[in-house]
């Protein structure tokens, strides 16, 4: 049975890529990416085209699905985020992530949405977005930030706050968090602070080289407020058994990340009764064990 489907939908001003996983009678998953195809249009025109396309798809190809995570990629967050938020406030009943990462096609906005069918959702009082299905509770967080003095302090506060959010739901960072995304302003300057804070917080949460880490992205990305040096998206699951979670190791080709001073897994997969979800870290892969066969390579 081929339960995976991919299709592209072209409209006058947008191109949508749709990836669907159909599990029969269980929850179906969608990843969609909506691109503007008119780089010459104003930001407002591109934004409206993307939003109109999304609204249309909800009545057609995505009928019955609910948004779990939306991530908007902007070319100039400082001048664009307020307009986006003003237009999407009523429809923001999911984890919302907004980051300045200009689309490579020269447009001003792109939208990635993760959707599910046959789930119950709610926004928790602590800001996490809860998704219930079967025996599992999934917690998504988008664009968490603060304005502490530097990237180290901001990251430490983000992670400590997240630990408390999880504790309120009977969860632990080490046992339940599956994936994090860190978007770092001027990453070449500020990433060292992120690494230091993450390493130090992880030790307090039993996340060490002897146990395991969390698959993650650490990449350049800006918030609309220049004082925000780090913003964080998160995903955790309650109800998993330890044997359902596995980590990607390839010792003949990739050394452990702690050997070069950072604390993340290169990949994680989670087994459910009807599917396997795979989370690959979105970061540079460094291998200290590589030996070039030729000085020219």
Language-model segments: which ranges?
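Extended repeat-based interaction scaffolds and adjacent low-complexity, acidic/S/T/P-biased segments
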Residues: 13-26
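Catalytic strand-loop segment that frames the active site of acyl-thioester-processing enzymes
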Residues: 23-40, 134-147, 269-289
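Phosphate/pyrophosphate-binding loops at sites that engage ATP/ADP/AMP, CoA/4′-phosphopantetheine
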Residues: 57-66, 166-176
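Short, conserved loop-to-beta-strand elements that form functional interface hotspots
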Residues: 69-116, 192-237
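Short glycine-rich or small-residue beta-strand-to-loop segments that form or flank ligand, phosphate
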Residues: 69-75, 179-186
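Surface-exposed beta-loop interaction hotspot
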Residues: 116-121, 127-131, 233-274
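Cyclic-dinucleotide signaling modules
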Residues: 131-136, 156
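Conserved small/polar residues in nucleotide/adenosyl-binding loops
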Residues: 290-297
